[in-house]
Amino acid sequence: LTLLRERKAPTIHDVARVAKLSKSTVSNVIRNAPGVSAETRARVQAAITELGYKTNIVARQLAQQRTRVLGVVIGDLANPFYAEMAKLLESFAAARGFQVMFCNTQVDEEVELAGIRSLLEHRVAGLLFLAYAGSAGGAQAAVGGNLPVVFVTCSADWGDVVAVDDFGGVAAATQHLIGLGHRRIAYFADTVIEENADNDRKAGYIRAMTRAGHRPQLLRWDAKPDTVIADGETRSIRSVLTGPGRMTGIVAANDLHAIDVLDCADRLGLSVPGQLSVVGFDDIAIAGLARIGLTTIAQPKEMMAQIAIETLERRISGALRGGRLRQITDFTFVERTTTGKAQE
């Protein structure tokens, strides 16, 4: 019988022997350290190619007590906005030599905290939050003060922030409806009350309504089908959109909520924008489809993702030190076909 022995993988010692250089010189070439001549680099590369040597990137990074991996905490991947932002973050991270690990929390504090701890166990070099449930303070305690953190499209009282002007965006959306003659305009959000972007957006709506002398009306989905919470009471969506004193304009906290409202209007036989005008927020890809044509506030997703990755990389490298950065980008008002002049 012929016994086949597994070929031993070449080591850095083998590369040094073939290149006729010291192990430390070979290591400098592999690490792309400065001060190494082009001739020496060529000799090492030739030896690596001849032997089929592969560097153990993970082992090398762990030995240096860091990895080139970033953790991204996502609120809900079912929301296209988060999915679009996650893709952009991954792309910009890859361009800078980082890999990305994702944690989908459903904006649940316990799930969020467990996910953060898992990312920390993988020794991520930094964290990016696309949504922040708060984790009852546990997230900040788990992360500590040494790991760079950037909040993207959301905010907290710790870490750097990259976000759009949420307040100004919703104020502009509300003013647009007021300018079209609408008076009964509601702000529509989810049952999950977030302590960051949603509060700023809600405040922008309230400011615009009160300055125009109109009564703000806050709505959010109830747990029961086709019902909402209005003024602390459970009401049917039908009564809000078709009953006495019905709403003629809706400003939604995001595009998904706006599309939900459009669906309700369709089932109730309401014409949009004839009987109801709707504005969203985010400008997700499907908002621009001809069958939807959603008027919305566009976030500069690509710009925010790029700024977030650059900020985190500078924190990791030590090029950026000092206090928290809060970088706020401008929004773009995108008028499509779901808004029109008030008919009553």
Task: Label each region the model flagged.
Residues 50-56, 110, 130-132, 231, ...:
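Short gly/ser/thr-rich secondary-structure transition/capping motifs
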